[in-house]
Amino acid sequence: MAQMIGETAAKIKDDLLLSVAGEILKFVQLARITKDPRSGFFPARVLRTFLKIQGSKNIPIQAIGLSLYEELPNTTVEQVGTEVIRTQWLDFSTLGEKSLVGKRVLIVDEVDDTRKTLGYAVKELQKDVEEQYKLLPADAPPTEFAIFVVHNKLKEKASEIPTNVKYFPGAEIDDLWVDYPWEQQDIVEHTRLAEEDKKKHVGDVNRE
């Protein structure tokens, strides 16, 4: 059975999000944050607070939805776990001034596991932006992409991050199952259990 790690929301906010926010700020400069609506909303929302520049507007957050393991209507058993399915995507026909052209786009997710969904997101967003550039003058400003993940699992990945895409992991971890507090129905109970598990782990280490 795979091991599981659990962290409190406060620890993730202070140790993993705030610690890397300064480096991301050098890149962002009023970027747009794109996140998975299920797994990336909490870290994206907290990061936006940390990256807020006094006197400026909030950084816009836009959502994309990708599913790898969820059984969805019109999907086959063979697709689950092997094929990335779009459940929500940007509507470039209605974005107007919110277009990604000429922007710095930070893609936010909880965990970089196999990198199937994250690699898909980067590739497809870059393709969409390239299509937009075909309709613009040759001197249109470039779009830059970067990625922030709360945890990067140290394991073999299904794809490589392009060299022109900056990558900001909050923490590097072994291939463990991560139990995030914002995915729990009772976040207070989750925090209590996470603290108990930490004390138990410390006790086990001391006995060794």
Give the ranges of each region predicted by the language model.
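Alpha-helix termini
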Residues: 15-25, 51-56, 91-98, 126-140
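Short, glycine/charge-rich flexible loops or terminal/linker lids adjacent to PRPP-binding catalytic cores
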Residues: 55-106, 112-123
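A structural signal for isolated positions on well-ordered beta-strands in alpha/beta enzyme cores
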Residues: 32-34, 62, 106, 144-148
